[in-house]
Amino acid sequence: MTTEAADATDRLVTAFDHHDPGYTPRTAERINTEIRERGVTWSPAYGGIWILSRYADVRAALTDWRTYSSARGVHFPRAEGMPMFSPIDYDPPAQRGIRERMAAPMTGDAVSAMVPELRRMVARLLAPLAGRGHGDLMAEFAEPFAIEVLGVAFGLSESCRARIREATRTMWTYISADRDASKFWPAFHALLAEEVERVRDEPDGSYLARLAAMRRDGSPLPDEELYSIIVSFCVAGHDNTMNSITRLVHTLAQDPALQLRLRREPELRPAVAEEALRRWCPTDRFTRVTTREVTVAGTVIPAGARVVLLFDAANRDPEKFPDPDTFDPDRGNSHQHLSFGHGIHHCMGVHLARAEFAAVLDELSRLPLFDLEQPSDLHFENGRHIMFDRVSVRFRTGEEH
């Protein structure tokens, strides 16, 4: 570790700020580990925030929504003028109603019906890379795959699919930098309004068309509520998936022995996907606000406190996952990670995400072995999403499929 990185680590362990320039993918794991080893901690950032980082503490907070409320927004600090996102920025009973309206495209039955199409997408996107023997598995595969799945599952137009990634990237940039929603929300709002108008004018039977036609107490859902639901689908539906798949294929590219094992033992593939999610959480943290004074591991957190939940640190807690920094698909409890959340805000897209991972691993196991062609650089997007700049790989020639 460089002197600069060491200084940043020392500073941020006691004054944690996920938007500090010193909090990078290279320093974050060490910072999160040291914070976890200290137990419940407090930082003066943003007027004072509390940090929970042990697995048991984070899971308990996710379970107890009455004490740890989402109703003041889970993204923090919030950009001025930023809308509330559905359903993650709501508590029951409103949260329950929103989830019910959002559930249709992500039920087990709906996802099962999509599986053949998922497999066709994966095969079609990977074929050109394998055919020429090399390519970028992030830009040429993970990103377009995640966006195409989103479009098919929810009924987004080709035009919207082409623009959604840039709109999301712009949003994350300004949330963390200027914290001014006027820099990103009007354009995002216009994109969503265009989609809603399209399906209202020409209903096509898609989930989006059904959502736009929904009524509550005899009246149509307000447009702003629709946009809040759709933006949550658009962002979570492709951003987290893209980053998770990128991490998964990057892991495989560095481990040909694991690739071979997945060919011999296809039953191991789900465990590999879950272990990748545990080891590299796609969304590093969310926040809550306490509704009452609460004692955690002997530390009193006052009512009205902003609490940061460090998912990465919890997923690497040795009390829950022995030797946590080692990628080990045989550990047996990888699926108990918190990368999909827990409790009332448990990820609604979990069935779809797991079906996507299965399709990816199945198709890659039919292709030649592949190796990382050049190093990949990591960066934070909005201080929460750890992303690669690329995953450049080369497929081996003459390898057994």
UniProtKB/Swiss-Prot annotation:
InterPro entries: Cyt_P450, Cyt_P450_B, Cyt_P450_CS, Cyt_P450_sf
GO biological process: antibiotic biosynthetic process
Name of protein: 5-methyl-1-naphthoate 3-hydroxylase
Organism: Streptomyces sahachiroi
Top EC category: oxidoreductase
Gene (UniProt): aziB1
Reaction equations catalysed: 5-methyl-1-naphthoate + NADPH + O2 + H(+) = 3-hydroxy-5-methyl-1-naphthoate + NADP(+) + H2O
Cofactor(s) needed for function: heme
pH curve summary: Optimum pH is 9.0.
Involved pathway(s): Antibiotic biosynthesis
Protein family: Belongs to the cytochrome P450 family.
